[in-house]
């Protein structure tokens, strides 16, 4: 099993959720987060035109964090590529700030309510 963690734009959350639902992944954890990357907190992420004076002020006062959504999905090993392709497919705009995907191994999953383990706990 793998945990696929994706950091995506908030305005892409609905289409991401719908696309994952279509391939059978309805269960996920979504957390509002703040972050900064190559866009240094000044991209079109906030949907306003940045004037040169504002840009200079932004850099002189430090970087601002941009709202993002962090998605965590635990998937079977054989589904990892499909989940990644799905997330990329609906989030890729070719612009800085599209996000990142991280994949980590999961040793065990246990459903608290029933005590089921492994793949049974994911169903």
From Swiss-Prot:
MF terms (GO), sorted A to Z: ATP binding; enzyme regulator activity
Pfam family, one: P-II
Keyword Protein biosynthesis: no
Keywords: Nitrogen fixation, Transcription, Transcription regulation
Domain of life from the UniProt record: Archaea
PROSITE patterns hit by this protein: PII_GLNB_CTER (PS00638), PII_GLNB_DOM (PS51343)
GO BP of this protein: nitrogen fixation; regulation of nitrogen utilization
Gene Ontology CC: cytosol
rRNA-binding listed as a keyword: no
PANTHER family: NITROGEN REGULATORY PROTEIN P-II, NITROGEN REGULATORY PROTEIN P-II HOMOLOG
Family to which this protein belongs: Belongs to the P(II) protein family.
Record function comment: Could be involved in the regulation of nitrogen fixation.
Protein name from the UniProt record: Nitrogen fixation nifHD1 region GlnB-like protein 2
């Amino acid at each position: 099993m793998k945990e696929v963690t994706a950091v995506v734009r908030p305005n892409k959350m609905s289409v991401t959720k719908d696309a994952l639902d279509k391939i059978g992944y309805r269960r996920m954890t979504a957390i509002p987060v703040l972050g900064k990357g190559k866009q240094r907190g000044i991209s079109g992420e906030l949907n306003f035109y940045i004037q040169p004076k504002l840009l200079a002020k932004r850099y002189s006062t430090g970087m601002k964090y941009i709202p993002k959504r962090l998605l965590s999905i635990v998937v079977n090993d054989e589904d990892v590529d499909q989940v990644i392709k799905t997330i990329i497919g609906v989030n890729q705009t070719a612009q800085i700030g599209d996000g990142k995907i991280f994949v980590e191994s999961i040793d065990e999953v246990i459903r608290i309510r029933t005590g089921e383990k492994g793949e049974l706990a994911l169903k």
